[in-house]
Amino acid sequence: MKREYKFSSILLIVIIGGITNYLLYNLITALGKDNFILEFLGDLITGIISFVFVFSISSGLIRNRMGSVGDYLNQVNYLNMKVLTVGFIISIAQAICQYAFSASGAISVYKAMASPSNSSVFVIGAIVLPIVLLIIFLVIAMFFAYSNFYLADHYDTEDGVMEIIGKIFSQGKRLFKKTLILGLKWIGIPLLVLIGLMLSMLLVKDEMLVVVYLAIFIVGFVITILITSIILMVRFSDVYLDDKYGIEA
């Protein structure tokens, strides 16, 4: 069931969070250029900040959907050590999976490039395997698509950390079909925009026009990604609330 929400409040929070992370990360890395520890610290801090902003939006979407920016940001009051711990563990697990898939995919591409004479190896290594790994990563991510909504809704639970993670996974498994449909719909839109813009650029012969089109393309794609990601989060919150109250969509 679709519910009303205040798009402008969520959009402003996303922008504020993005700018905050960008400035903070650049400040930290500027203090110690090529310093692994500082870069790691920057990633850690920006990751925590991102989680706080996303948690605020998620909590607002299940408690005060039509609230102002301040109402959404006040949702940080529901953050506690257990919520942060669970969020941190899930984020680390997803990051490890993403890194493992990226690394293995890169190795496959490298091996394929090193053996271009074998067309079957090239196709599997350079094209098929990276796509398969990406799909696996996205499938795993879908099982935890409702983690922030669950944490915001059960911030005061007496369950242990691993028990909470288990319940989040079970909910993700139960809602997998709905999550997949929403993902295909709202991730497919940016992909179609991307493909359309890329194809249109192929028709342009003038180099100056190509530069102009490229700038328009980048801006248009970023705006599309921003809007669709917000709508996708809102639709996920609808699915979560429907599941919570036993509403059949």
Predicted regions and their residues:
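Membrane-interface segments at the starts/ends of alpha-helical transmembrane spans
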Residues: 32-42, 113-133, 207-220
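Short, intrinsically disordered/low-complexity patches at protein termini
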Residues: 33, 94, 106-110, 195, ...
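Hydrophobic alpha-helical transmembrane segments of multi-pass membrane transport/permease proteins
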Residues: 6-30, 39-52, 86-101, 181-197
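Polar low-complexity intrinsically disordered regions enriched in Ser/Thr and small residues
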Residues: 11-12, 20-21, 35, 128, ...
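Membrane-interface segments at transmembrane-helix boundaries
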Residues: 1-5, 47-124, 145-176, 232-249
